């Protein structure tokens, strides 16, 4: 019974970290978010100032162990931080969620030499961010399911390393990262689950260039971009784990990726809920505030239920991912995001309805949150694919 307490009782460290994050959001994110979101050039939505300020207060590196200059936050605390960031802006939450998550993976998956080469440099650089290259134009959410196709981005063995050709797209932090974990097909004729290798990739490697920055409907304070490889040589010492066994790294080292995505979108749901409550107190209809109308009151309570339930699911998944001996269940690595994103989308539409016509006007700020709320219906796996994956885990023949 003692084991489950951390999910329900916030400790002093967590409280202090979240206060720091909330102050950072209020000072650095909230004042800038609308303006950055409105810039028509998608690359300009990204703010180096925000990243540098996050570095100053220790957010950027918090999942690094103290040995590497971080706080060594566990997955539960990290999820709380990711949600708190998203209350200020979804894109800001996503750029740090990716970086914090990949820093966790690197400390498990990289060998000692690779860690010594990468982690101190990442920790020192106030703009240092991380990215993971999986998604391709032809291979999207189907990588969550055992699928017979290979990755199209492929590598040929050569003396001392590999020659990589191909392209990744929709990559979060793709144009901003200094280090990448890149998943590439190294064995022809095998499905991606059997013939892919994970490489450590540096930003300045010859033959690797950034393609376009995607012009997204929402989540615009995060950049997503194409990674292009033209005869890019990656040396053998950059192979992560074993050649051909790259796919295992995803499942083995990072079961809580899904819950982190869920935490980002739950932060957006929280921001929408707060906006709906504030408006319902302010807006007079039929001679009294909206919040005194039973239908609206009940709906605000239902929003609260959906947010609390999503958060509990996320916290349980994160805690058990770090303590799998206490009953980790693989569906916890798939379903929290599906639940949280459905809840957030429902809350977004309700918030817009409660605002009436004002919810459709840009200057009230609801429209931005609605665009952001749509992002995770597909991000980190299309929900339908995730339900199928969960079913395959539940009913494995």
Predicted regions and their residues:
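A short, Trp-centered hydrophobic/proline-enriched beta-strand micro-motif
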Residues: 125-138
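Short glycine/proline-enriched turns and hinge-like loops at secondary-structure junctions
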Residues: 73-74, 144-147, 173-178, 192-195, ...
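Flexible, small-/acidic-enriched active-site or ligand-binding loops
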Residues: 204-235
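A short core secondary-structure module
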Residues: 165-209
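Alpha-helical interface subdomain recognition
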Residues: 1-88, 112, 157-162, 228, ...
